[in-house]
Amino acid sequence: MADAPIAPVVLVILDGWGYRQTTDYNAIAVANTPVMDSLWEAYPKTLIRTSGKDVGLPEGQMGNSEVGHLNIGAGRIVPQELVRITDAIEDGSIFQSPVLINLCDEVKGRGGKLHLIGLSSAGGVHSHLCHLLGLLDLAKLHSVSDVCVHAITDGRDTNPTEGVNVIEAIQAHIDKIGVGRISTVCGRYYAMDRDRRWDRVKKAYDLLTEDGEGDGRSASQILKDFYAQDITDEFILPTRVAPGAIEPGDGIIFYNFRPDRARQLCYAFTMPDFDGFERDLIQPLSFVTFTQYDPKLPVKVVFEPQSLTNILGEVIAKKGLRQFRTAETEKYPHVTYFFNGGLEQPFEGEDRELIQSPMVATYDKAPVMSAEAVTDTACAAIKKGIYSLVVMNYANPDMVGHTGNMEAAVQAIEAVDRCLGRLLGCINKMGGTVLITADHGNAEYMRDEEGNPWTAHTTNPVPFILVEGEKRKIPGHGANVVLRNDGRLADIAPTILDILQLPQPNNMTGKSLIEPAGFDVKTNRTPVRISL
């Protein structure tokens, strides 16, 4: 006789769906969201924290998708590379890194240039300005005189025109220590694509490898001139400021600590079988990355990966249960690589399906994105009745929120709400239980206090809703499930194990969001009741 279909636990991550009581420029509050509104009213819910020390970041630092999914999947607060690298600069240990010292020696020995490439930003999501300044100090300390800074401007995790202030800070540090020059500026739209849009990456690559003098303008003046044309930091056209092309004999330090948007440019420079566009492999070329972007990359790594064991996916696999992951291109690495603690390979019994994101310049042009296809894929997997855990991500609130387009963000939120309704129907038919949450805020704050577009993440909490299924009841609770109101992302994995009745490993230090059976709301405390 065939096994009975499995009623799954489904974790739905609404990427960038934060909570903010104020409705001004709040795309989530303004949008028509009957599904989420009804769930918030009818089912156990709470708010959880997604930023700062609650996710292993410095106090007050906004969370992001990488950090969020890493914490969710690990079931513990994971110390982040931002803190790890900043500490190494502040205590001076980075200046004694054998990897960096060897690179400096190789460059000097060949009479080459040292190129510093990365996101020039104080956003702290992919990189940090203090890390670049620390590398300039490293070059001076080790007597590397020919140093080229290739500034990738942000405008996505920061204010759209904050780049000029960052550039001026870099130039001030260069002037102070007498080492380095800003050779190029380029928006992250080109240099940090992660969706295999090789035409964009090629423009950045060509800028870095084709030399020239520039036209005499400073880097800050170039940015100001672009601003006057309504071209903001993210979209700064690849522009040469001063001589300093990457040539044989040179060395590169790519100082982004987050891998997903650094990989493609690194592939172009280092992989012999690269086929994204035609180019000649530059050799010899010493190439160092701050963190491991991809184990296949033939580069040296300064900060080796931290080992995370007994994470959620691993626990599920060890129990012989099957799991499924799906998202569209923009968030696929997050439900796979990051959710699995930085492991590329799936666990045994872990199936994945990637949905292609729309090929548009910016997602406000297609705010529905691929949410319908993600829903179709998740429903098809759920109906198979073979998965105990399904993890999925709706990218719309975050990706459209990053555009700063309020109207499009509202459309994105409404699209996700419609898809959520259809998804719940599929899960309900299987008797499964649903956990609905987010990895960080974004779309709830689309303008700053002065009315300017806000394209970055926020430090706001996010909703967490538990929709209990008929065939996947919370053990021992009956109809009286109560959620804690002091949770964080690291508590989600223990909650899932709680529902699946699986033991929680000792090094998974998060705590289930479900209060113990028999919890008396009246005599202990009253959970926070907030309406969206």
From Swiss-Prot:
Binding site for substrate: H126, R156, D157, R188, R194, R258, P259, D260, R261, K331
Presence of keyword Metal-binding: yes
UniProt KW keywords: Glycolysis, Isomerase, Manganese, Metal-binding
Cellular component annotations (GO), alphabetically ordered: cytosol
GO terms, biological process: glucose catabolic process; glycolytic process
Cofactor: how bound: Binds 2 manganese ions per subunit.
InterPro entries: Alkaline_phosphatase_core_sf, BPG-indep_PGM_N, Metalloenzyme, PGAM_B_sf, Pgm_bpd_ind
The protein's annotated pathway: Carbohydrate degradation; glycolysis; pyruvate from D-glyceraldehyde 3-phosphate: step 3/5
Catalyses which reaction(s): (2R)-2-phosphoglycerate = (2R)-3-phosphoglycerate
EC number: 5.4.2.12
Sites where the protein binds Mn(2+) 1: D398, H402, H457
Cofactor(s) named in the record: Mn(2+)
Positions of Mn(2+) 2 binding: D15, S65, D439, H440
Molecular function GO terms recorded: manganese ion binding; phosphoglycerate mutase activity
Active site: S65 (phosphoserine intermediate)
Family: Belongs to the BPG-independent phosphoglycerate mutase family.
Cross-referenced HAMAP family: GpmI
Free-text function comment from the UniProt entry: Catalyzes the interconversion of 2-phosphoglycerate and 3-phosphoglycerate.
Classification via NCBIfam families: pgm_bpd_ind
Subunit: Monomer.
Annotated protein name in UniProt: 2,3-bisphosphoglycerate-independent phosphoglycerate mutase
Organism listed in the record: Gloeothece citriformis (strain PCC 7424)
